[in-house]
């Protein structure tokens, strides 16, 4: 699939003929300064949400298979439920967001991230876990909208560098969660899951209070 993606990119993505004329040295410091206050608020909330995502993510399969007797085949079904749910909601939600404001859709996505660890903790059967994985799929609900909002909030003359710097900073900081996740799990699944939910709630509240809403041009 990776090879197919490379071939498609080579044939169908056209290079800007003026790209060479626009090239200039890009400094990380300048890119960081391109993060506007509104974009910084989105970044802070997004980092907290990624903590909520990363803390339990390595232990979801352990929780389902080892702790609750789910078979590997059943877990494969659960994973498929999550993936299909995400696929089904992304495009309709993105269309709705283009016709209105983006903040409600991003905020709803953050709520799903915060709720998933709690729902997962109380899901002890295959049927209950099916519901939990529907919720996991709904975490993709507003992802295209959030990415569009990043570009909307980035400076007009530095959108690409601001976008890349946003993800660099987010992923570096969010990777810290991986170091503490195992320690939290060893304290107990509930400690791990509810700590993740607390970070998710903090990110959701922060964005609800400080996140900027934008009306679509259409």
Residue ranges and their predicted role:
Residues 88-101, 185:
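Helix-to-loop junctions at the C-terminal end of transmembrane segments
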Residues 141-154:
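Intracellular juxtamembrane helix-capping segments at the cytosolic ends
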Residues 15-48:
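Juxtamembrane intracellular "pre-TM" segments in multi-pass secondary transporters
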Residues 58-75:
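Short amphipathic helix-loop junctions that connect adjacent transmembrane helices
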Residues 1, 62, 66, 175-192:
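Transmembrane alpha-helix termini and helix-breaking/packing motifs in multi-pass membrane transporters
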Residues 1-19, 203-211:
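C-terminal membrane-cytosol helix-exit motif in multi-pass small-molecule transporters
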Residues 121-132:
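Helix-loop junctions at membrane interfaces in 12-TM secondary transporters
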Residues 104-119:
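Structural signature of the two symmetry-related core transmembrane helices
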């Amino acid at each position: 699939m990776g090879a197919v993606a490379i071939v498609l990119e080579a044939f169908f993505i056209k290079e800007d003929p003026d790209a060479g004329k626009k090239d200039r040295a890009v400094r990380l410091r300048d890119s960081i300064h391109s993060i506007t206050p509104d974009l910084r608020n989105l970044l802070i909330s997004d980092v907290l949400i990624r903590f909520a995502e990363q803390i339990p993510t390595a232990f979801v399969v352990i929780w389902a298979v080892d702790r609750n007797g789910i078979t590997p085949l059943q877990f494969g079904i659960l994973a498929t439920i999550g993936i299909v749910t995400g696929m089904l909601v992304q495009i309709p939600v993105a269309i709705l967001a283009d016709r209105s404001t983006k903040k409600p859709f991003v905020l709803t996505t953050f709520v799903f991230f915060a709720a998933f660890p709690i729902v997962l903790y109380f899901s002890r059967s295959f049927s209950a876990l099916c519901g939990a994985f529907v919720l996991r799929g709904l975490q993709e609900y507003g992802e295209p909208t959030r990415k569009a909002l990043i570009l909307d909030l980035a400076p007009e003359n530095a959108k690409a560098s601001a976008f890349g710097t946003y993800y660099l900073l987010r992923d570096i900081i969010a990777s810290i969660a991986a170091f503490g996740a195992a320690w939290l799990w060893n304290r107990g699944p509930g400690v791990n899951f509810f700590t993740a939910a607390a970070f998710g709630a903090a990110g959701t509240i922060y964005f609800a209070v400080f996140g900027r809403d934008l009306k679509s041009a259409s």
